[in-house]
Swiss-Prot record:
Its EC number is 2.1.1.-. Keywords: Cytoplasm, Methyltransferase, rRNA processing, S-adenosyl-L-methionine, Transferase. PANTHER family: S-ADENOSYL-L-METHIONINE-DEPENDENT METHYLTRANSFERASES SUPERFAMILY PROTEIN. The gene is rsmG. This is Ribosomal RNA small subunit methyltransferase G. One of its GO terms (molecular function) is rRNA (guanine-N7-)-methyltransferase activity. Its main location: cytoplasm. Belongs to the methyltransferase superfamily. RNA methyltransferase RsmG family.
Length: 210
């Protein structure tokens, strides 16, 4: 499975070293080890291969991040660290701010970022509604329907900024997009570059209007 992961990274044109791979393996093992204690992932994905697929899905957004080239990225609702920790691991030159409201998960994120030596990671523990800073790039994954949070996320998006939402089936993404398109200067659906039997898309929201 790890061989397939490396092959996928090459297809995504994501540079990596043996240290990156070793640290990713360490991270996944820690997620599995502490899942019960910190309520990190559901029972049906508590195995290494399933976690590796989550990591691969997470890193598939990196080409979009690099194309936009923000100084820092805000990952909202980081949970166990997908995609925030994974992106930070393969993109060490950029700061990643992980926003997580759960105390248990925030503790885990702080612990694992220290153990991985991710000096480019900062963990914030509060609700997204309480965030005061503005960001030029925001990521969300497994965050539910974008319609519920579009205005909240837009309010902390810098002028000219971009929200990148990891999404699944095209019909659902298109439906969500139809409700939020008037809130942003530009809305785009971009297919994932991963070779997979599952539908994966990114909903990209550019420059909040309100």
């Amino acid at each position: 499975m790890m061989t397939n992961f490396k092959f996928a990274l090459k297809n995504l044109k994501v540079n990596f070293t043996s240290e990156n791979i070793d640290k990713l393996r360490f991270y996944i093992e820690k997620v599995l080890l502490f899942s019960d204690r910190f309520n990190l992932v559901s029972n049906n994905v508590r195995n290494f291969d399933a976690m590796l697929l989550h990591a691969l899905d997470s890193v598939s957004g990196l080409p979009i991040v690099k194309d936009k080239n923000p100084r820092q990225v805000l990952d909202v609702g980081s949970g166990a660290g997908f995609p925030g920790i994974v992106l930070a691991l393969f993109d060490r030159c950029r700061k990643y701010v992980l926003l997580e409201r759960s105390n248990k998960k925030a503790i885990f994120l702080k612990m694992i970022s220290l153990e991985l030596g991710l000096e480019n990671v900062e963990v914030l523990e509060h609700n997204v509604e309480e965030e005061q800073n503005k960001y030029e790039f925001i990521t969300i994954r497994a965050f539910g329907d974008i319609r519920k949070y579009a205005n909240i996320l837009g309010s902390i998006l810098k002028s000219g900024g971009l929200i990148m939402a990891y999404k699944g089936k095209f019909d659902k993404v298109e439906f969500e997009m139809s409700y939020v398109k008037n809130l942003f200067d530009k809305v785009e659906i971009k297919s994932s570059e991963l070779i997979s039997d599952k539908e994966r898309y990114f909903l990209l929201l550019y420059d909040y209007k309100c």
